[in-house]
Amino acid sequence: DYQMDEAMEAVRSDIQTIEMYRQADSLAQDTELLYDGTSEVLKRYCGLSEHNQKLFLDTLKELEIQLEYISEYPEDIKMIQENAQQLMSFSIFSDKNSFTYNNIIKTAKDFSKVSEVSLYIVDNNKAVEGLVNYYFPFYLSLIMMVFIIYGLSGERDNGMWEVVHSAGNGRLRLALHRLMVITGSGVIVTAGLYFSTFAASLFLYGGADSLSAPVQNIQAFKRFAMPMSQIGYVMYDYAYSTLAVIVLSMVLWAVFVLNRKRNHALIMTVLFAGLEVFMYFRIDIHSVYSAFKQFNIVRLMRVNEIISTYANRGKGSFVISESAIMFCVLIVILCIAAVVAVSGTVVMRPQQKRSVFTKILDKIYEGYQHIFSKMPAVVKELHKLLITSRGITVILVLLAIVIYFVGYGRMTFSDSMKQCDRIYLES
């Protein structure tokens, strides 16, 4: 503790010396009064270019923040446990069958696991911090899985479905092979994108020597209640994220299996994904519709936000962490989606009985084609481009995206912010 306090004092002194020098320099005062050649930090600072001088000062300030955090972390963890003991002494929290009581007990127990974690200064944590907050590899993984599943469903459109379905003993084998292909693809695609991004992050920021340091060295993980190294957390994040990609891929495969036309399944997928993105970014966390933001595909793919934040849910004496809830829900969805997809592949027939409604639609379509045959060639070409080739769908999707981003650029204010602004204007 003494060495830490000494280091903090030295860093603060260096920052103060540099800032006094910069202030004197900006006021065109005589800087020689400050720089007499004896200050090592000023000697290094003055030998740098203007750009590197700013980086040098910023680095010192970051070091000061990190030193303060490291020195306060043990006391912070100790205070969590002491607060738990104090809260249980109050009568309103003393009911042993209540969620509040059991949540206090679990919180104290969980953070006792990291009470012995020793933090220390490292070169930098930016490689891991940048990686776990960069979610595009998982979004790209899902997009690639859409293409893979679309390709696996090719027999629905190329006339081979009848041939595939006629092999009675082969349908289950085909379904199981596809199950393994989708699972393996999810693991490999996610690993390729995730670890290539990790390598790029290490190349860009450096800090490979810091990977063995506790992940709690990163200030964003001060409420992470598991003793784990930074490289350990990278693997932990990858495992959870891969599971999420595989589960969503299984759900997507089930959607493709249950739709007789894979293009219909693709359109449904795009529309649903667009709706999920819209709800995640447009619904406020305090809105009555916040459940659509909490239970959302986008939030599911932002795995780090869930597993790195300490939060419990439950009822009565049953208390469980959000990360555990996420894992259980993913496993349940995975099993259901896999069973539906495999069963659908085995059971669904290429042909289905024509209902009365289908026959009526066929008659309407015949009349439509009879009228359409008399149209000019230009109208037929437009019909082929917009309707037959589904160009109108692409146009509508692009239009919706443009309208969304145009509207998203506007500032939105809560009622409390509007009230504060009104008070300010009236005063």
Task: Outline where the language-model segments fall.
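Residues that define the loop-to-transmembrane-helix transition and helix capping
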Residues: 172, 262-263
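Hydrophobic membrane-insertion alpha-helices, especially the h-region
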Residues: 393-407
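Aromatic- and glycine-rich beta-strand/loop motifs that create alpha-glucan
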Residues: 355-395
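Terminal transmembrane helical anchor/hairpin motif
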Residues: 1-2, 8, 18, 207-232, ...
